[in-house]
Amino acid sequence: MPPKTSGKAAKKAGKAQKNITKTDKKKKRRRKESYAIYIYKVLKQVHPDTGISSKAMSIMNSFVNDIFERIAAEASRLAHYNKRSTITSREIQTAVRLLLPGELAKHAVSEGTKAVTKYTSSK
């Protein structure tokens, strides 16, 4: 049999339980990751006087996520075919060439090469 507690002790135990449940009910707000700020920066570089609606931003964010997933999957496949365990810039570049059509692939590769060069020179 559990030990009997006095009336005051039982009330205190009940209050302690209530305080714990109140703090547990507070949910931490999870941060939602998005490319919105980067999409907005590019938009302002290309068309400084143009805005973007939240729905259009959501579509653009989905588009960027989709393209990145496709490039990552293709690069992974290429590394697997060549019996490599590391995805390098070479696999990414080849994946971009395979996924994007013609002139778009050329521009993407040149911009990517420029970004990698800038990053390595800043280190």
UniProtKB/Swiss-Prot annotation:
Principal subcellular localization: nucleus
PTM note: Phosphorylated by the catalytic component of the Dbf4-dependent kinase (DDK) complex Cdc7. Monoubiquitination of Lys-118 by Bre1 gives a specific tag for epigenetic transcriptional activation and is also prerequisite for histone H3 'Lys-4' and 'Lys-79' methylation. Deubiquitination of Lys-118 by the SAGA complex is involved in activating transcription of a large subset of genes.
Location of N6-succinyllysine modifications: K44, K114, K118
Subcellular location: Nucleus; Chromosome
Keyword annotations: Chromosome, DNA-binding, Glycoprotein, Isopeptide bond, Methylation, Nucleosome core, Nucleus, Ubl conjugation
Region (Disordered) location: 1-30
Protein name per the record: Histone H2B
Gene (name only): His2B
